[in-house]
């Protein structure tokens, strides 16, 4: 039985390696161009997604994703978070008058939550708003970061992103970020990508870029919506991420799509875990 089990593990690993290799060859061998119809469909998806925020950000609204769940499921989710788990769920927004498919593109929509015990918003917010330190705090996914502009609750920032899964790729990205407050215990921020360009040679991250909207299509858009709530002796942190990438090659979507969709989920999980680690570490020093 042990032999059979180990053989299955070996076969699974070989199959996974083969699929990753196939995915790398398929995507690297063909360039992808962001088309107006793809952008328009993604923009409609974002508008439909953001339309529910008005209700969620009301003083009596379901501020966190789990607040809108049935009572028993919400209770269990809070318990899991207090026990140290990171919760990540796949979401899908229904776009009025249109399907959820994006022509020549894929939307990746996830929400994740983590609980940071023993801290306050006063401990947490200065760290997450220190965009100049993103490369230090979120390594290896962020390799350079700086604040471009800052006025009140509005920021413009630059992040150089490093992604390594089936291949290595580097992006120069810029975001417009707006911070708001529901009440003294609840804060939120919306981060909207305004520019994403793939670096031509990932081994030279400060090198020449591909024109915006060209390259391999690994990342065309990235919006993140953050919520912070102080209660239960700590801070609940939620991040909802909506990103746009190229679609899979015709005929291989059923095989490769699960591998591609796993990347943003893993990135979100890692970012939440890193944020918790950093906030806990820094709060002990203050």
At which residue positions do the language-model features occur?
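N-terminal secretory signal peptides that target proteins for export/translocation
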Residues: 1-12
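Short, charged low-complexity linear motifs
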Residues: 24-34
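Bacterial N-terminal signal peptides
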Residues: 14-26
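Eukaryotic helix-grip
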Residues: 32-286
